[in-house]
């Protein structure tokens, strides 16, 4: 037994003389390596998050305005005066809208062309949807209607007019897809009809409770029909006539580089939506006191201020692509957005109001109805030949200026 112990001792001394690690050190070596690997993985993950955050923040100059997000939330939480709450949260929504568009674009790149186009169509007017739902919950039906109409007019007249002027700076005549233009003309006509018919129906009935109830039923029935048409429009654009409605060269040239993964895009979309909802809630909640302090009408706030601010990032995009000569893209952003609001967002909010017992209708005041009809008529006339120039853009901008002037003096 003693001899065996001596032999084992000699072997251990021999191993140590050749710098072989002892058994206990050998067993600890993999554990130390594992801890090192985990530490490196955490550092790489942190660097990856920092890199993605930097890329997201540098994706648009509008992100410099993100500083207004916490300030706007603080102003709303501590109930500052209405003007401060409204202005700060209005400024906060601008970069949030840009981030929402960025997250949607990243998700669409991952999802593929068809599903990506559907995502862009669904989230294209997310700001108007969020503001509309929050205003609807508060019973601010006038804000909902005026913001919908204002978004349509700002896209048709202001944005499309600026696109025509911008592209006219570099080109004498600009052409675009005549098939897409004709389809949009038909959809704009249907959009106008969904507002003209309820207005005419209202004026043809006596002013009593039964008439209001009948108008509500007509609006809700119209909303269901129009939503079906909108779904069929998506099928037309994304499936059956995809080759006609989309220019592959323009889509390829305008595709953004992929920065975020699937989970990162979804997480960013969810987080930004939450912040938009918070800022929009404070924004809508301050309107009643704001119109009393500043002495302007709710119609002007909803029809002019909210649409321009909420779509600022999208408006800039349309102007930039039109300057590059990509008028089909500009047409899709400007007029396509108006069609989406009229055929999807407005009827969808009517259905939401139906569900939560808010009597939102598609009936607009006579001045608003006439202005929409004139605007759609002018745009239809300008795009029906598939070519345009800068003077036509000036005409659209002039009409928008007249509309703003009229609603500035519109009584409360």
UniProtKB/Swiss-Prot annotation:
Superkingdom, natural source: Eukaryota
Ranges annotated as spanning the membrane: 56-76, 84-104, 115-135, 149-169, 178-198, 216-236, 265-285, 300-320, 335-355, 359-379, 390-410
InterPro entries: CaH_exchang, CAX-like, NaCa_Exmemb, NCX_ion-bd_dom_sf
Single Gene Ontology BP annotation: calcium ion transmembrane transport
N-terminal signal peptide: none
UniProt keyword annotation of Phosphoprotein present: no
Name this protein carries in UniProt: Vacuolar calcium ion transporter
Record organism: Schizosaccharomyces pombe (strain 972 / ATCC 24843) (Fission yeast)
Gene responsible for this protein: vcx1
């Amino acid at each position: 037994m003693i001899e065996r112990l001596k032999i084992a001792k000699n072997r251990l001394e021999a191993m140590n003389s050749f710098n072989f690690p002892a058994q206990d050190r050998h067993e600890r070596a993999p554990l130390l390596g594992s801890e090192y690997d985990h530490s490196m993985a955490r550092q790489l993950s942190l660097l990856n998050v920092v890199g993605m955050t930097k890329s997201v923040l540098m994706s648009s100059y509008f992100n410099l305005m993100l500083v207004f997000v916490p300030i706007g939330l603080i102003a709303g939480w501590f109930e500052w005066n209405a003007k401060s709450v409204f202005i700060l949260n209005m400024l906060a929504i601008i970069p949030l809208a840009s981030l929402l568009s960025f997250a949607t674009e990243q998700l669409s790149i991952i999802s593929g062309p068809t599903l990506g186009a559907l995502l862009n169509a669904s989230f294209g007017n997310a700001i108007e949807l969020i503001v509309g739902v929050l205003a609807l919950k508060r019973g601010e039906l006038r804000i909902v209607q005026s913001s919908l109409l204002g978004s349509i007019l700002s896209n048709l007249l202001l944005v499309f007019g600026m696109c025509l002027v911008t592209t006219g700076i570099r080109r004498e005549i600009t052409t675009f897809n005549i098939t897409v233009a004709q389809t949009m003309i038909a959809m704009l006509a249907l959009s106008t009809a969904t507002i003209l018919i309820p207005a005419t129906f209202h004026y043809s009935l006596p002013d009593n409770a039964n008439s209001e109830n009948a108008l509500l039923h007509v609006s809700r029935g119209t909303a269901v029909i129009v939503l079906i048409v909108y779904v069929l429009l998506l099928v037309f654009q994304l499936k059956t006539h995809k080759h006609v409605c989309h220019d592959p060269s323009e889509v390829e040239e305008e595709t953004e580089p992929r920065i975020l993964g699937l989970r990162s895009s979804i997480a960013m979309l969810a987080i930004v939506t939450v912040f938009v909802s918070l800022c929009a809630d404070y924004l809508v909640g301050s309107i009643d006191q704001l119109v009393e302090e500043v002495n302007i009408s709710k119609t002007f706030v909803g029809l002019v201020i909210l649409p321009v601010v909420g779509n600022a990032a999208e408006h800039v995009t349309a102007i930039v692509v039109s300057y590059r000569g990509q008028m089909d893209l500009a047409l899709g952003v400007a007029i396509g957005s108006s069609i989406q609001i009229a055929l999807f967002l407005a009827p969808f909010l009517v259905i939401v109001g139906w569900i939560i017992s808010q009597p939102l209708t598609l009936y607009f005041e006579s001045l608003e109805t006439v202005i929409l009809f004139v605007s759609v008529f002018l745009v239809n006339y300008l795009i029906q030949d598939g070519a345009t120039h800068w003077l036509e853009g000036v005409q659209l901008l002039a009409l928008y200026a007249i509309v703003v002037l009229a609603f500035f003096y519109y009584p409360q």
